[in-house]
Design a protein with these regions (language model features):
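Generic non-transmembrane alpha-helical segments
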Residues: 139, 143-154, 241-249
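Zn-dependent metallopeptidase/amidohydrolase metal-coordination segment
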Residues: 188-226
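Active-site/ligand-binding-proximal alpha/beta "capping" segment
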Residues: 150-184, 260
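Non-catalytic positions within long, well-ordered alpha-helices that form the structural scaffold/packing
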Residues: 78-81, 179, 198
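His/Asp/Glu-rich mid-to-C-terminal helical/loop segments that flank catalytic regions of hydrolases
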Residues: 215-263
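Short acidic/polar active-site loop segments enriched in Thr and Asp
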Residues: 83-84, 184, 203
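Metabolite-binding pocket within alpha/beta catalytic cores that recognizes anionic/polar moieties
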Residues: 1-133, 289-291
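A short, charged, Gly/Pro-tolerant segment at domain boundaries
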Residues: 255-291
């Protein structure tokens, strides 16, 4: 769908399984070379912009963080000409000042995960190394911060998201160590999404919706699924308010640095690219392969 208008993607995290504000909706069941995405994508119009929504864990919350097919999810969005992604996610706070139901917009990631298979589109004859020093789109992050403030929400612009495997929550030792390192929130899903979005030349920002204090705060009950889900409805409604405010403010044309992230990343000479890999990565390599 490279001839379609540049679109905006929303990845919904725990508690955010639909966006009722989308109009003229259509369902898209997409098969990718990496397997199926988490669920059908819902396309629709929001304030005159084409938007595609994907529930990260599937409708009904059926998929563990470790079971997510991140490549299929990002590939499916890119095949629909998505050039911006707002990734909404539930996180635990590692700092007193970040409270449940606050929003934190990370500026950095620290990857403590060990399950990195499938965190790149490349290989099979084509080598690429994207720059990831600044893993979040600054323009999109600032736009989300301004939008959250405008609708009256408590938002923190910047901070470090530390990623863990899960599905179990942190031990107290892990939580305290993360705090001592100066990390701000902890989650299980966003690092691979950000890496793959960068490879797909999509500008991504994470909207981290705080549900708990992890387990470092000994005077409170440690995080549990019940704790998290107790805040999800309120956080989902807050996220929708931000999305409705932010999406009309995203530029119509993709001309940010993230939209050219492969310019200096591709290492393998074009003449050596295997035909099968070119075909497989069509939506990602289209502007280099002429397809």
């Amino acid at each position: 769908m490279k001839d379609s208008a540049p679109a905006i993607g929303i990845i919904g995290g725990s508690g955010l399984y639909q966006v009722e504000q989308l109009r003229d909706t259509t369902e898209h069941k997409i098969d990718t070379p990496f397997g199926p995405p988490s669920d059908a994508l819902i396309g629709g119009n929001l304030s005159g912009r084409q938007v595609y929504f994907l529930p990260r864990h599937g409708r009904g919350h059926r998929i563990l963080p470790q079971e997510l097919n991140h490549r299929a999810n990002i590939y499916a969005l890119r095949s629909l000409n998505v050039r911006w992604i707002i990734a909404v996610t539930a996180v635990g706070s590692l700092q007193e000042k970040y409270k449940p139901r606050d929003i934190l917009l990370p500026s950095q990631f620290y990857d403590r995960g060990s399950l990195r298979a499938g965190h790149t589109f490349f290989g099979e004859g084509i080598v690429a190394h994207v720059s990831f020093a600044e893993p979040i789109s600054l323009q999109l992050r600032n736009l989300l911060a301004e939008s959250a403030k405008k609708v009256g929400l408590t938002v923190h612009n910047g901070g470090t998201y530390v990623s863990m495997d899960g599905p179990a929550f942190s031990t107290r030792a892990e939580s305290e160590l993360n705090r001592r390192h100066g990390f701000d929130v902890v989650g299980m899903t966003n690092v691979p999404e950000a890496k793959l979005a960068r490879e797909a030349e999509i500008a991504l920002a994470t909207m981290a919706m705080i549900t708990d204090y992890d387990c470092w705060k000994v005077e409170e009950e440690p995080v549990s699924a019940q704790t998290v889900f107790g805040h999800l409805t309120a956080n989902a409604e807050a996220a929708k308010k931000v999305l409705v405010e932010a999406i009309p403010r995203i530029p119509a044309e993709p001309d940010w640095a993230e939209h050219r992230s492969l310019d200096n990343a591709l290492v393998t000479e074009r003449k050596l690219w295997p035909e099968g890999t070119i075909k497989k990565l069509g939506p990602i390599l289209g502007r280099f392969s002429g397809r």
